[in-house]
From Swiss-Prot:
Designated name of the protein: Glycogen synthase
EC number(s) from the headed UniProt entry: 2.4.1.21
Organism ancestry: Bacteria, Bacillati, Bacillota, Clostridia, Eubacteriales
Keywords: Glycogen biosynthesis, Glycosyltransferase, Transferase
Catalytic activity field: [(1->4)-alpha-D-glucosyl](n) + ADP-alpha-D-glucose = [(1->4)-alpha-D-glucosyl](n+1) + ADP + H(+)
Record organism: Clostridium kluyveri (strain ATCC 8527 / DSM 555 / NBRC 12016 / NCIMB 10680 / K1)
Gene3D superfamilies: Glycogen Phosphorylase B
């Protein structure tokens, strides 16, 4: 079985969010269970230079973008057993950022056609092309209308994964003719039209053979008007083809027993070493050094989706108590300024770090007692999975993948690996934090919760198997 992943980013080459983590990890775990996987992404100037130098130039050709023919170079390397391709065009991809440009529609129109043209150019025919998010949504459209009849391309199947339905790639309807050489009937019949625009996301959903998303609960949620972003009706109509598969994390990268980024390695049988991480980070971040004070962590993009609005409503009530808060991330200016304000007013209780640093993130995961993730919605979420791995107890809102992966602590049975609340409300969040702090003060109970958290299995080994089953259902 041959599967080609097409995506807009992949760790470790280039990353802006969780999509890159999935594309950088899942293929390796699929390979371990017998799937021949390859990956293709754009050749951005932002790709780390020491990794970019590992790629070898294969060939070049020209890709039609409307009436123009655009240069396309193909580079290849093998990384951790998986073959990666880079699609090169300096005009489209040598820019300061990956996304957010006026011509993003044209950039990914080029990429989507280049992926299909590349297959013939390098004589590689996958059984399945696995597309990811809106950036690759036009690949199955182009295939079924312009490529399917060719003997070389015949028989290829498509999986389209929704990592976040909010971002839909909606562009002016004129791009169908101007960039894809497609007639307006696709827009008029509604198969690619959404809210008066051509939607790459809707196109991918409509023209793929199977659809997946990154947790079971999110698969149900996006079929409702509340979460469906005006695509709930389409998703309900395709519910029999919609799979919800929870993301995993790479247990080799996130391993408190071997992690060389943290102060002291530990496991569930040696939690005293976790405490050493806590005392060290309190010292480094100029917080009061006290092992009995619960340390709460936020490692996140600062956006409304991540629950920042309800955190703002309780921030001062929270940190004026006997707790500490460590914040790491960037995002909307109003949230950055709020966290700066908290740390200036409560400098011994709050450490605000308005940037992202992977080493510091690992240290915070290892050192903290609790991890806040009160998302408005969350397709899957990786932060809570990493926190579990490090015995840092997640406090989450019951939505999407958070609901699937965090089992609320039950004081009667002793079961559970975290704490959760249902309503998107600051008072409810504060109440559940207070409950967690109460249990934190009862060390035997708390250590039991930590042990359960560290025993949770969220490795990609678990998630790769249902993906293989999904592929097999198409063959």
């Amino acid at each position: 079985m041959k599967v080609l992943f097409a995506a807009s980013e992949s760790h470790p080459f280039v990353k802006t969010g969780g999509l890159a983590d999935v594309i950088g990890t899942l293929p390796r775990y699929l390979k371990k269970i017998g799937v021949d996987v390859r990956v293709v992404i754009p050749k951005y100037s932002a790709i780390k230079s020491h990794l970019a130098s590992e790629f070898n130039f294969i060939k070049y050709f020209y890709v039609p973008v409307g009436w123009r023919n655009k240069y396309c170079g193909i580079f290849q390397c093998e990384y951790m057993g998986v073959i990666y391709y880079l699609i090169d065009n300096e005009y489209y991809f040598f820019r300061d950022e990956l996304y957010g440009y006026y011509d993003d529609g044209e950039r990914f129109a080029f990429f989507d056609r280049a992926v299909l043209d590349m297959l013939w150019q390098i004589n590689y025919k996958p059984d399945i092309i696995h597309c990811n998010d809106w950036h690759t949504g036009m690949i199955p459209v182009l295939y079924k209308i312009q490529y399917k009849q060719s003997s070389f391309y015949r028989g290829v199947k498509f999986v389209f994964s929704i990592h976040n339905l909010l971002f839909q790639g909606n562009f002016d309807k004129n791009i169908l003719g101007e960039l894809f050489n497609l007639d307006g009937s696709l827009y008029e019949n509604g198969s690619v039209e959404l809210n008066g625009a051509v939607s790459f996301m809707k196109s991918g959903i409509n023209y793929s053979d199977k659809i997946s998303t990154v947790s079971r609960s999110y698969a149900f949620e996006i079929q409702s008007p509340e979460y469906g972003e005006n695509l709930d009706g389409l998703l309900r109509s395709r519910s029999s083809d919609l799979w919800g598969i929870v993301n995993g994390i790479d247990y080799d990268i996130y391993n408190p027993e071997k992690d060389n980024m943290i102060f002291r390695n530990y496991n569930k049988n040696n939690l005293r070493n976790k405490m050493i991480n806590k005392l060290k980070i309190q010292n480094d971040l100029n917080l009061d050094i006290n092992e009995n004070v619960p340390v709460l962590a936020i490692i996140s993009r600062f956006t409304p989706q991540k629950g920042m609005d309800i955190i703002k409503t309780i921030g001062e009530r929270l940190v004026s108590k006997h707790v500490q808060l460590i914040v790491l991330g960037t995002g909307y200016n109003e949230y950055e300024e709020y966290f700066r304000y908290l740390s200036s007013k409560y400098p011994r209780n709050v450490s605000t770090n308005i940037y992202f640093d992977d080493v510091l993130a690992h240290k915070i995961y290892a050192a903290s007692d609790m991890f806040l993730m009160p998302s408005l919605f969350e397709p899957c979420g990786l932060g809570q999975l990493i926190a579990l791995r490090y015995g840092t107890i997640p406090i989450v809102r019951e939505t999407g993948g958070l609901k699937d992966t965090i089992i609320p602590y039950n004081k009667y049975t002793g079961e559970g690996n975290g704490f959760s609340f249902a309503n998107f409300d600051g008072d409810d969040l504060l109440r559940i934090i207070n409950d967690a702090v109460d249990y934190f003060e009862e060390k035997d109970i708390w250590n039991n919760i930590v042990t359960h958290a560290m025993e949770s299995n969220n490795s990609w080994d678990n998630s790769a198997k249902p993906y293989k089953s999904l592929y097999e259902s198409l063959l």
